[in-house]
């Protein structure tokens, strides 16, 4: 635990106890999501979404409670269902704020987040561009075009 961030360590511990049947099912679901996105990209070059659902959060807004941190430190002592409950609790508050970014993490697609607007307080709002697997070149080319048009704020 000294050489690993607490949330990463907790996820690692949960992975040690995941039943093989469930692990296989999860991998199959990830493959299905990847296939669906590959089909999407046969028609569309880019998926455009907001990066997040709002402006930047306040510092510490999604900080883990002391109680949750203590439970995570003892993650190895819990059975797998309890571990899953704690992992969900780790992310639950922030998922409403970042509903769009997980997809690329699950499917392995290249994505880029770009600041395209500033609100009245100067906080950036961004868009996320997601391309098909292996099409990082498309993201870089589009980003260059946007930069040349002074789109970034």
What would you call each of these model-derived segments?
Residues 18, 24, 90-100, 105-153:
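Structural helix-boundary/capping segments
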Residues 72-102:
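Aromatic-anchored helix/helix-loop segment that forms the rim or "lid"
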Residues 1-38, 54-83, 115-116, 120-123:
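Short helix-loop capping/hinge segments that flank enzyme active sites or metal/cofactor-binding pockets
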């Amino acid at each position: 635990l000294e050489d690993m961030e607490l949330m990463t360590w907790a996820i690692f511990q949960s992975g040690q106890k995941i039943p093989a049947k469930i692990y296989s099912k999860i991998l199959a679901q990830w493959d299905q999501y990847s296939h669906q996105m590959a089909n999407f990209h046969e028609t569309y070059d880019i998926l455009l979404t907001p990066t997040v659902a709002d402006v930047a959060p306040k510092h510490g807004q999604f900080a883990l409670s002391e109680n949750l941190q203590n439970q995570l430190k003892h993650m190895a002592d819990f059975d797998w269902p309890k571990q899953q409950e704690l992992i969900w609790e780790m992310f639950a508050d922030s998922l409403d704020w970042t509903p769009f970014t997980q997809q690329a993490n699950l499917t392995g697609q290249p994505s880029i987040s770009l600041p395209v607007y500033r609100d009245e307080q100067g906080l950036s709002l961004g868009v996320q561009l997601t391309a098909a697997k292996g099409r990082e070149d498309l993201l870089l080319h589009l980003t260059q075009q946007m930069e040349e048009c002074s789109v970034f704020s």
